[in-house]
Amino acid sequence: MVKSKYLVFISVFSLLFGVFVVGFSHQGVKAEEERPMGTAFYESFDAFDDERWSKAGVWTNGQMFNATWYPEQVTADGLMRLTIAKKTTSARNYKAGELRTNDFYHYGLFEVSMKPAKVEGTVSSFFTYTGEWDWDGDPWDEIDIEFLGKDTTRIQFNYFTNGVGGNEFYYDLGFDASESFNTYAFEWREDSITWYVNGEAVHTATENIPQTPQKIMMNLWPGVGVDGWTGVFDGDNTPVYSYYDWVRYTPLQNYQIHQ
């Protein structure tokens, strides 16, 4: 009888220990492997690569976005084109395009060759972003390059760390960005972000830098309720387009810093 109890005790202990080991191992896999991390790439947009990219839709963002994202508003055939068009939905007056990577990216150089829309009330962007909808438990971290269609001779840089923004910086380009393709970039390090225009460093931030891996994104949208920032969008101007020639990501350890 004593021997029987002893065997039962050993069996229960073995079962519990096995569960503990399996659980511990599974948690390690989740932390180490589940978040998909991207590597260096160059995207020419000759065709749509659904292994690298996802088109947004069908859903809406916050209240200042007067559009619903639709996948058909993103096309790629040598150039990637985002489009705003009229379409009254239950929530918004227009449909628009947004593209994002499937993988996450960390410190490095993020570059784009693009031509923004020159229409008041619109925002053309290239940025990185993550939040709780992108990965469970992630803070709202974001790094922005944005063009306001009301004045495409200027570019806006911004970033958010755990939802805290207020880091806007406007730079006068000396040319109209909507008239030709130019290269815009930011170098993201653990302790700084430096933005570039055609290879020239034009702004650096060093305070409260975001740390979380993020997805690379591009979108074009009409604003509403933020007229002081974007200007007023006139729907008679639709369709509206922004164009992207190429995108490149280079991990920090893989490139020489711009001089």
UniProtKB/Swiss-Prot annotation:
It comes from the Bacteria. Residues 1-31 form the signal peptide. Keywords: Glycosidase, Hydrolase, Signal. Its EC number is 3.2.1.73. One of its GO terms (molecular function) is licheninase activity. It is an enzyme of class 3 (hydrolase). The active site is at 142 (nucleophile), 146 (proton donor). GO terms for biological process: carbohydrate metabolic process. Optimum temperature is 65-70 degrees Celsius. Thermostable. It catalyses: Hydrolysis of (1->4)-beta-D-glucosidic linkages in beta-D-glucans containing (1->3)- and (1->4)-bonds. Residues 35-255 form the GH16 domain. Hydrolyzes B-glucans containing mixed beta-1,3 and beta-1,4 linkages. Belongs to the glycosyl hydrolase 16 family. Beta-glucanases of Bacillus have a substrate range similar to lichenase of germinating barley. This is Beta-glucanase. The lineage of its organism: Bacteria, Bacillati, Bacillota, Bacilli, Bacillales. The gene is bglBB.
